[in-house]
Amino acid sequence: MADFTTIARPYAKAAFDFAVEKGQLDQWGQMLSFAAEVAQNEQISELLSGSMSADKLAELFIAICGEQVDEFGQNLLKVMAENGRLAALPDVCTLFFVLKKEHEKEIDVEVISATELSDEQCANISQKLEQRLERKVKLNCSVDEALLGGVIIRAGDLVIDNSARGRLNRLSDALQS
């Protein structure tokens, strides 16, 4: 599938701004998620890349979405269809949720540890990161035994490598230079 990020950005921003203005962020998130799932359907994908007129395509897409998409969501779909951009809906949805998380001061944090973390350890990591990042943190914890010990934390552009493997690699690099 092609990368539609650049194409999707203005649509996502417009939908986000409208949703904020109307106080309907969650509703718009649900609508866009549903429309993105429809757009990713194999049969619908073929229609989107076909030669159907924009009006017919918008009409068909809106009919498939049914009551899952309100009149304002339908207007977005019509505009995207007129511009031949319905295939970018999954990227519009993704970018919308990025904007929503920024707006809600929330960040996804990946925590990779050498062993399974307890609930108490996860809560402690979450609390410390919320203080440091000044955002609400959503932890996604996983285990990688290759780390030997410690953790790696990834939050947006921030990476904290406090693993034994990372320390050994840094020590090795220092000794080689």
From Swiss-Prot:
Location(s) in or outside the cell: Cell inner membrane
Keyword entries, A-Z: ATP synthesis, Cell inner membrane, Cell membrane, CF(1), Hydrogen ion transport, Ion transport, Membrane, Transport
One Pfam family of this chain: OSCP
GO terms for cellular component: plasma membrane; proton-transporting ATP synthase complex
Cited HAMAP family: ATP_synth_delta_bact
General function of this protein: F(1)F(0) ATP synthase produces ATP from ADP in the presence of a proton or sodium gradient. F-type ATPases consist of two structural domains, F(1) containing the extramembraneous catalytic core and F(0) containing the membrane proton channel, linked together by a central stalk and a peripheral stalk. During catalysis, ATP synthesis in the catalytic domain of F(1) is coupled via a rotary mechanism of the central stalk subunits to proton translocation. This protein is part of the stalk that links CF(0) to CF(1). It either transmits conformational changes from CF(0) to CF(1) or is implicated in proton conduction.
Subunit structure: F-type ATPases have 2 components, F(1) - the catalytic core - and F(0) - the membrane proton channel. F(1) has five subunits: alpha(3), beta(3), gamma(1), delta(1), epsilon(1). F(0) has three main subunits: a(1), b(2) and c(10-14). The alpha and beta chains form an alternating ring which encloses part of the gamma chain. F(1) is attached to F(0) by a central stalk formed by the gamma and epsilon chains, while a peripheral stalk is formed by the delta and b chains.
UniProt-recorded name of the protein: ATP synthase subunit delta
The organism's taxonomic lineage, starting at the top: Bacteria, Pseudomonadati, Pseudomonadota, Gammaproteobacteria, Vibrionales
